[in-house]
Amino acid sequence: MFRIASRQTRNLRALSSSKNWARSLVNTRSFRAAASVQNNNAQIGEMVDKISSLSLLETSELVKQLKEKLNIAEIAPMAAVAPAVASAAPSEEKAPEEKKEEKTTWNLKLESFDAGSKAKVIKEVKSLLGLSLVDAKKFVESAPKVLKENILKEDAEAIKSKLEKLSCKVVLE
């Protein structure tokens, strides 16, 4: 900052001592830079005025031509979704050739139960989920409801077989 101030002071001293101070002022570097900035700002201001007077269709055409001239690629509005959609299409074609990955985690859903075995179902749900008797009763009565989420297939099948023995309808999702 000190250098800038001393340079400006030097320029002012040179101007005040010279007879043709106007010519000296125009020849200083800082004045030329300021003049070019003003010219650029004037040009930009004119462009802004012209662009703002364009209609929506004309603006769209302007954007299209600028993209072509500057070699700007089209970008999808949801860039994260576009690659996923693009990669999903080829995999559907290869699906018959490749084996589908087997689901590793399952959700166990209690669909319905026999009213005669309600007490046994409540006890089983109480022990499976670690709920109090009242909470287990409310859970069973609010069926259909997800019993357990993200459990292994073997565990889900074991629980399903226990509940089916109590005449419950259980679904693996």
UniProtKB/Swiss-Prot annotation:
Annotated keywords: Mitochondrion, Ribonucleoprotein, Ribosomal protein, Transit peptide
Extent of the transit peptide: 1-33
Family matches, as SUPFAM superfamilies: ClpS-like, Ribosomal protein L7/12, oligomerisation (N-terminal) domain
Major site of localization recorded for this protein: mitochondrion
One Gene Ontology term of the molecular function aspect: mRNA binding
Subcellular location field: Mitochondrion
GO biological process assignments: mitochondrial translation; translation
One GO CC term on file: mitochondrial large ribosomal subunit
Database matches in InterPro entries: Ribosomal_bL12, Ribosomal_bL12_C, Ribosomal_bL12_C/ClpS-like, Ribosomal_bL12_oligo, Ribosomal_bL12_oligo_N_sf
Gene3D superfamilies: 3.30.1390.10, Single helix bin
Biological role: Component of the mitochondrial ribosome (mitoribosome), a dedicated translation machinery responsible for the synthesis of mitochondrial genome-encoded proteins, including at least some of the essential transmembrane subunits of the mitochondrial respiratory chain. The mitoribosomes are attached to the mitochondrial inner membrane and translation products are cotranslationally integrated into the membrane.
PANTHER family named in the record: 39S RIBOSOMAL PROTEIN L12 (PTHR45987), LARGE RIBOSOMAL SUBUNIT PROTEIN BL12M (PTHR45987:SF4)
Annotated family: Belongs to the bacterial ribosomal protein bL12 family.
Subunit note: Component of the mitochondrial large ribosomal subunit (mt-LSU). Mature yeast 74S mitochondrial ribosomes consist of a small (37S) and a large (54S) subunit. The 37S small subunit contains a 15S ribosomal RNA (15S mt-rRNA) and at least 32 different proteins. The 54S large subunit contains a 21S rRNA (21S mt-rRNA) and at least 45 different proteins.
Protein name (record): Large ribosomal subunit protein bL12m
Organism: Schizosaccharomyces pombe (strain 972 / ATCC 24843)
